[in-house]
Amino acid sequence: MSRFVPRIIPFYLLLLVAGGTANAQSTFEQKAANPFDNNNDGLPDLGMAPENHDGEKHFAEIVKDFGETSMNDNGLDTGEQAKAFALGKVRDALSQQVNQHVESWLSPWGNASVDVKVDNEGHFTGSRGSWFVPLQDNDRYLTWSQLGLTQQDNGLVSNVGVGQRWARGNWLVGYNTFYDNLLDENLQRAGFGAEAWGEYLRLSANFYQPFAAWHEQTATQEQRMARGYDLTARMRMPFYQHLNTSVSLEQYFGDRVDLFNSGTGYHNPVALSLGLNYTPVPLVTVTAQHKQGESGENQNNLGLNLNYRFGVPLKKQLSAGEVAESQSLRGSRYDNPQRNNLPTLEYRQRKTLTVFLATPPWDLKPGETVPLKLQIRSRYGIRQLIWQGDTQILSLTPGAQANSAEGWTLIMPDWQNGEGASNHWRLSVVVEDNQGQRVSSNEITLTLVEPFDALSNDELRWEP
């Protein structure tokens, strides 16, 4: 027994230190929550201060826990049980300290982010500011909202979104929905996203659907937000926490989609992006991205991201040693979702010139004069009309003005009995406006009704 006591005393001392550490942390939290309930100002209590038996209670709880543990028949002697019990208490205390350290990065006010980007031409397109706000955060799930403004060549884009995240084993999964509005052009779209984050790998997928119809951009062109999707994988280096790499695939659908914001439209374009992020301290991240399209067009972007977390001391946000904690799976629950906040636009030619050629009556006779009815809508007037088809045989005649839609007539030709004669003629018109734009009309067919006197004597013979 005398040999056992010296061996067990160090473990009890270690146990008391661990318990004291946890108790000190609990006391600190209690003081922060109830600053006026503590009598630590050195004034006499005049015999009214309640006695504090927290230390005795804590020691009694430790002894009770050890007694219950030692009752289990696990094949260990008393010394080994004491050692395992003490190490378990130390592990729990350290785990509590780590969790509280990580939780200190999660302020109920969320975090504000300012991202400044510069493209090949020195423009700040894509620069944005956002505010991530946790609405409800507990052990099961996180409900959040985000407000943001993104700079585009056409003006500001507002981004408003809500979403949820919850833990599934070693993964953090979630979904979100966003409403993006190009304020100056009054163009809107909806975004639907899903995400799955691991400790060193983050996967994100987004789908974008335009809300608004086509809007006039110029006198000859219309625009709207394009429909499309993107897939992104982001990897954090386990051996060097300051570096992140990312790869993203995106595609948008339409005949003239300006994926690179360069003024050139492509049909259903696809682009692949490779990115590298360097985070020296939690507050600052430097980004570099190369975007390559299948058409050969490419784009390079450099960015500086400032990510300020409310409620977290600035000294902590400027500490390089805090990068691993801030980017850990639990410490990054308040990070912004990975999505394209800068809308991609689709364009089409605006219909400033249209023409329709009405179909004449079906029962046309040889020598009959047929008026042609043209319906032309032109923003820039009419320069000329160019008739196509059997214009000569139909004796096409203009009205008072050759560039007017009014007064055009034709004269149906005689019935033809020769071999290969069809007595069918086709006609259409091309309209050119004063801007040089040309539009073709529909094609009409003019058919003669066979005259009575064209029948042969054999066809007129009666048989009794």
Swiss-Prot record:
Keyword Signal listed: yes
Gene3D superfamilies: Inverse autotransporter, beta-domain
One Pfam family hit: IAT_beta
Annotated InterPro entries: IAT_beta, IAT_beta_sf, Intimin-Invasin_domain
GO cellular component: cell outer membrane; periplasmic space
Name this protein carries in UniProt: Uncharacterized protein YchO
Residue stretches spanning the membrane: none
Recorded superkingdom: Bacteria
Keywords: Periplasm, Signal
Name of the gene this protein is made from: ychO
Localization per Swiss-Prot or TrEMBL: Periplasm
